[in-house]
Amino acid sequence: MIESSEVFDAVRRGYNEFEAASNSEILDYFSSIDGDAVAGHASHIKGILFEQEYVDLLSAQGVEAQIFEATNHPVTDVAIMDGDNIVQEVQLKATDSSSYISAAIEENPDVGIVATSEVAASFDGDMVIDSGIEDAALEQAVSETVLEEAVNPVSPLSVIGWMFGLPF
């Protein structure tokens, strides 16, 4: 289970203006965002949360890895380390869209992709690695922690989300 503190850490990492913000300040901001912006924020936070969760998972398995400092690092998201040396860089994709993964492979055919479990299962070979982390769990953690006020089951935005297949 993904803890709410991990979601708040992802927000602080992904938004410079929240680097020193309290949980309450973060919640206040997201409770007042425009409904059109919710999906973009959810995707951004989910991607950063996925990076954190994957590095933690590797660490628990005795594999040293690090997230690049910049959240917009070109092409790759995580470096697999051997001491001070980077032995491999991988791109992470928190999605349930196989076409999104296919496009990433086409754009960067020499870069391995680590994907959420739902979509990784639809690929054969070594290019897409199953992270062992479910996209649905990431979406749920983000929506329940920081977007619950922005989107609730009876709000007009939730109805729009259901119509367009958004996870809220």
Where are these regions (language model features)?
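Interdomain/boundary linker segments immediately adjacent to catalytic/signaling cores
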Residues: M1-K46
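Helix N-terminus capping/helix-initiation residues
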Residues: E3, S22, S97, T116-S117, ...
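Intrinsically disordered, low-complexity regions
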Residues: S4-F8, S102, D126
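Generic preference for hydrophobic/aromatic residues in regular secondary structure cores
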Residues: E6-A10, A65, I113
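Catalytic centers of nucleases
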Residues: I26-Y29, D36-E106
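Extended, hydrophilic extramembrane loops/domains of integral membrane proteins
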Residues: E107-P153
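Short, glycine/alanine-rich hydrophobic alpha-helices that insert into or span membranes
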Residues: P153-F168
